Structures are given as C-alpha cells and as structure tokens.
Amino acid sequence: MAKAIKKVVLAYSGGLDTSVILKWIAVTYGCEVVTLTADLGQEEDLDGVDAKALRTGASRAYVEDLREEFARDFIFPMMRSGAVYEGRYLLGTSIARPLIAKRLVDIARAEGAQAVAHGATGKGNDQVRFELAVNALAPDLDVIAPWRIWDLRSRTDLTAFAEQHGIPLSTSSKQYSMDRNMLHCSFEGGELEDPWCEPGPNSHVMAVPVEQAPDTPEYITIEFKKGDAVAVNGEAMSPASIIRTLNTIGGRHGIGRLDMVENRFVGIKSRGVYETPGGTVLHIAHRDLEGICMDRESMHLRDQLIPRYSEAVYNGFWFAPEREAMQAFIDKTQETVNGTVRLKLYKGNAYPVGRTSPNTLYCHDLATFEDCATYDHADAAGFIKLQGLRVRGYAQRVKKD
C-alpha cells in the first residue's frame, strides 16, 4: 500500500477472527480502527458487540440495522430475476456481501478512512465479493485482507494472539462454519468436508428435518406487485417481514434444505449445506405467477440471463455494469407480474396449486379442450407447414444420403 493508512473501517462480527483482526490491524499499521457490525437478520444477539469492539481497541463502533434495506434493495431485486446458481443455490451468502461492502465504503467516507478491511479467508468467495464491491464503489480505498498477509495460520494461533492481547474469548465451540442472515443459513467445514457424509442434526437451524414436519399440509397465499411480494395470507408486510414470515412458515415444513458441491469463483469445489425456507417458497411462488402473466418471449429471454445474472451475484459483480443492465431488463419484464399465488406446503415441498392475476395472459377459450369458436384447429396445419420448412429442407439436402 503506497499511501499511509491512518484509519481503517473493519467489517466486524464480534467473533474470534474479526476481534483478532481488529487488534492486529491496530498493532501492525499503528492506525485507528472503526468497526461496522451489520444486522442482516442473522438472529444473533448483537447487544454488547460495540462495547467489545471498543474494549478490543476500536475508536468507534457502528452497529446498524440493515434488515429492511437488505430485503428491499438486494434480496427482492435478485428474486425478481429468478436467480439460482448452478441450478440449485439461491445465493443467500452472496447477496449479503454487497450491502456490507457498501456500508463499509459509506462509513469510510464519513470517517475519512483510507482503507476498509474484512475477515474473509484466502480460499473463499467472500474476499472476492467484498473487494470487487469496494473496487466498484470506491476505487481509491485500499482493502486490507489479513488472512492473506499475516502469519497466523490456525485457530490455535488466533487464540494465542487473543490471549496475548487480552481479547475476550468465547468458550463455545461450533461443529460447522456457519453464515446466517434473514435469507438463509449456510454450513461448511467439519464432517461436511467429506462429500459422502450426511449432515448431522446440528445443521438444522431454520428448517426442521423433513421427518419432523407436520403430517398435515398448510395452504398459504402470497401476493405480488411488479414481481415483489407485498402480502402473505392477505396481510400487507414490509420486505423484511415477508422474508421472516415465510421463514417461519416454510421452516416448520422442512422447506428449503440444500446439500450440494458447488464451484467457487476462485476455482475450488466446495460442499455446502444451505437452509433457505422463506426464499425457496418465494422463488417457487414468483416463478409460478410469471407463468400466467408474463409474455412468452420476454420470459424465455429473461431465462437465458438467469445463469449469467446468478454468476454475477455469486462472483461478486453486484455493482458491475452488466448486472445493472440485466436488472434493468428484468425489472421491465416484471411490470406485469402482479397477482396472487396459492401454495400447499407439505414435507419439504411447496406446491403451487392456484394463481390469479389482473394481468393474466391465460385465455380459457383458447386453452380449453372443449369446442370453441375462438380457435380454428385447421389453422394449425399452415403453422406447422411453415415451421417445418427449415427441417424439411435440411433433411432433403443434408440427410438424403
């Protein structure tokens, strides 16, 4: 780093890693450290985390409730796109990083800091997500990533450093490396590093094991306006409240469990177990509503963008021009995605069983198997003949041998 670092803003959880990082940055750079702890609905008690940061050496500690902004400006736009990474993962961790990075930059500007810092390791995707976001929002800021530069290599090293510098240690131990926010909870490490090993019971936090789900189905309705959920069971709610409500409902039915080996952006295959109960229900309902009120060609074109959009989110390009351009097109397609979906929740599944929309493109007279005057079956012959010109010509010229 060419310029002098006098103040750093650190993404701080209050755990061992970021507490050690806080002290390490202060000692190594001889600079002031400001912390940001973001409440993204992770259901953790954040009382006292600011006091711990100050005791560990921070000059100022921000603890911010970002739940509504997270749901409104990050989760919901992503949900409108139908994003799903590698056909399975609903991007619960990925979508949280841009908001944290944005707030790091905002605070760095307000505090006159020269750098921001994070606690992501050198093997994971999060380091990329944080730093690409900072690059996009504040290219002049330096980024400090201690895990890539310090000589602390293990939990034992971290613990020794903490004891040496009087950093309070938690006595609890975790079976897995967990990351949670209002959209999902992820589990990695431990026994999960063996891809053949079934996840243990401690990997159930947001959703019950499907064997323990009720034996009776539950019916719910979700109302959408312009692709965003606005009400559950007829009750209007804020974006964050909708996610929380669907987490509770979907979680008790064991919905949203995923166990997969995915391709990290850094080139490593990684096994993760994810719980996304509310997001899964929302994803299924949204997709179903599109079927009745979204133009076919618009839908198919949008569907071609889903893998690319999902990769942009997963790889950390939320603030990149291509993601913003795709979002503009997606949002245009969502202008008519208005209506209500009825779902049946049962034993780990969410089944759409009804849908209605003021913008419906479904025409009963055209779709019915009964005789009607609207559709002339004879018209199909000319349509098929014209559609067959290309393949008939190919067969006559290329396949004649």
Swiss-Prot record:
A GO MF label: argininosuccinate synthase activity
Amino-acid positions noted as binding ATP in the UniProt annotation, renumbered to this chain: 11-19, 38, 119
InterPro entries: Arginosuc_syn_C (IPR048268), Arginosuc_syn_N (IPR048267), Arginosuc_synth (IPR001518), Arginosuc_synth_CS (IPR018223), Arginosuc_synth_type_1_subfam (IPR023434), AS_cat/multimer_dom_body (IPR024074), Rossmann-like_a/b/a_fold (IPR014729)
Cited Pfam families: Arginosuc_syn_C, Arginosuc_synth
Binding site for L-aspartate: 121, 125-126
GO CC terms in record: cytoplasm
Record-linked PROSITE patterns: ARGININOSUCCIN_SYN_1 (PS00564), ARGININOSUCCIN_SYN_2 (PS00565)
Signal peptide: none
EC number: 6.3.4.5
Primary localization class, coarse: cytoplasm
UniProt: L-citrulline binding residues: 89, 94, 125, 129, 177, 186, 262, 274
GO BP: argininosuccinate metabolic process; L-arginine biosynthetic process; urea cycle
Compartment(s) where it occurs, according to its Swiss-Prot or TrEMBL record: Cytoplasm
Catalytic activity: L-citrulline + L-aspartate + ATP = 2-(N(omega)-L-arginino)succinate + AMP + diphosphate + H(+)
Pathway membership, UniProt: Amino-acid biosynthesis; L-arginine biosynthesis; L-arginine from L-ornithine and carbamoyl phosphate: step 2/3
Class of enzymatic activity (EC top level): ligase
Keywords: Amino-acid biosynthesis, Arginine biosynthesis, ATP-binding, Cytoplasm, Ligase, Nucleotide-binding
Subunit and partners: Homotetramer.
Family, as annotated: Belongs to the argininosuccinate synthase family. Type 1 subfamily.
Listed name of the protein: Argininosuccinate synthase
